[in-house]
Amino acid sequence: QPPHFRPHGISLYIDTNGKRHLGIINHPKNRELEPENVELFSEDENGLFMHQQTITDPLFKSPNALVLMAQNKFYLGNDKGAETAFGKIQEQLGRPMSKIIYFNGDSASVAAENLSQISGINTSKNNKYLFASETAAKRIAIFSINENNGVLKKLETIKINGSPDNINVSSNDDLIVAAIPKVMALIQHFISFQKEEIMPAPSQVFQIKWDFNSEATIEELFLSNGEDISTTSVGAIFDSKLFMGSITDKKLLICDL
């Protein structure tokens, strides 16, 4: 196992033999001073995931999300991209500077850039399209994937009424997107932890039906003030139920659809 493990983004890949593999972002103790890593695990005969490889690259600046394309190939989304003090100010003011990185099994390269705070990425079931949450711009970016070199070509963006986080893709390629309805409420929620007077923050989940040949349809599946679950960061549909996870709450909320 890695000597230090501070996991963030996680992705599951199932190969043609049915064997499962995990890719997990592993933040260092001192972010911006030490390298960011991606840890690769594979399932053994007992169903346990054993560590296989640690991958690091200077392009892994501020990784937030990743999606495995094969056992050791993946896309990684940096939620920040600025490298200078002035650049960080520009980014805070809204300049899109995030990048999506492609690791081809040997080396990393920039697959897409000039994006607004990537917080979630996923692919269509046929691996021809990649979806990315541009949190600061309140939109989902849709890319076609070049199978030869991993480069992403932006096809369109879908605006939503919230700041998107992680994206799950259903069996019929619908996007299940967790979102932050009010960013200021999220900030107040984080501050309340320091004061030990927990203030709930609203939660939101969208279902987006997207087809290359038609306009996307957006349905709000869930919206609450945060009393039941605060700051939803992920949503998934299984067996006609919506499962939701949170940035801060140590629980899942399950709702009938």
What are these model-predicted stretches?
Residues 1, 44-58, 99-120, 141-160, ...:
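Blade-edge beta-strand/turn elements of extracellular beta-propeller
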Residues 21-23, 73-75, 129-132, 174-177, ...:
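Conserved beta-propeller blade signature
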